[in-house]
């Protein structure tokens, strides 16, 4: 079955790195990759000057998009990969939302947006905003200029307070299918014990993972969630971090941590954000 992948780009090295990652991730799959560039101009009303500017920006974007498409085709070895370009005059969030709906996108793969320049890598506040607003499609966000590593180990943090539907778990399973990845479910809590609701949600999650190699882990709640998750990633050589973005989820808790509010999310590996 053909997969449809959306690749937002600003023509930076970081966005090219995300494109290369996507091509390698789906190297054996039938895919159409959609390159998206947003040239939205923030203005209350379009004037003659802004219309001329928008036309110039669109012409420049088209030239760069065609060059980008040519680069992707020349560096690609899968004849079952197709490429298309989308140039939008709307802001990035609207551009992505419209593209997801129009082209029935399966996954968005992107580098960071609005990243800080303070030495360490962070998901910028623009990316955090995008994660909170894209609700129709999962998003795979990559660390800056991240070199492709086959996703063999996927971490899935949960507190078991949320009932996961099959639709919510499906993007996780599809990613695991690509490279027969092991799914490591990690429960971060003060105590290892579960209440009745959590036990039920655990049973349901186990049923979804029945045909996949998986394991369950418990971590004490000893620090900030960012620290705990990064420790888990390091200890078990995790290749991808996956979470469902629901109310009171770990993603919401991450974003509410003071350091995240100021500078964004600090990942070590690609981060799959699945909408509720």
Kindly give the residue locations of the regions a language model identified.
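A short, acidic, amphipathic alpha-helical segment used as a generic capping/interface helix at domain edges
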Residues: 222-234
């Amino acid at each position: 079955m053909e997969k449809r992948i959306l690749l937002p780009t600003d023509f930076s090295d970081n966005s090219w790195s995300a494109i290369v990652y996507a091509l390698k991730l789906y190297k054996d799959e039938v895919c159409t990759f959609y390159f998206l560039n947003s040239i939205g101009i923030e203005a209350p009303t379009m004037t003659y000057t802004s219309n001329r500017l928008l036309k110039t920006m669109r012409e420049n974007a088209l030239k760069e998009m065609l060059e980008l498409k040519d680069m992707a085709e020349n560096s690609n070895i899968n004849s079952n990969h197709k490429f298309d370009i989308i140039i939008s005059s709307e802001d990035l969030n609207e551009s992505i939302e419209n593209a997801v709906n129009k082209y029935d996108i399966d996954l968005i793969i992107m580098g960071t947006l609005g990243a800080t320049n303070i030495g360490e890598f962070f998901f910028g506040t623009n990316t955090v905003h995008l994660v909170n607003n894209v609700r129709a499609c999962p998003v795979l966000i990559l660390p800056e200029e991240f070199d492709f590593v086959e996703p063999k180990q996927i971490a899935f943090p949960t507190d078991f307070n949320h009932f996961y539907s099959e639709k919510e778990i499906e993007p996780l399973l599809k990613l695991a299918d690509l490279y027969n990845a092991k799914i490591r479910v990690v429960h971060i809590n003060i105590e290892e014990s579960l209440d009745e609701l959590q036990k039920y949600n655990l049973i349901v999650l186990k049923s979804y993972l029945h045909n996949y190699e998986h394991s369950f882990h418990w971590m004490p709640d000893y620090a900030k969630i960012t620290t705990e998750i990064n420790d888990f990633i390091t200890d078990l050589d995790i290749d991808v971090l996956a979470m469902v973005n629901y109310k009171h989820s770990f993603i919401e808790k991450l974003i509410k941590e003071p350091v995240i509010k100021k500078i964004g999310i600090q990942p070590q590996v690609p981060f799959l954000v699945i909408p509720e």
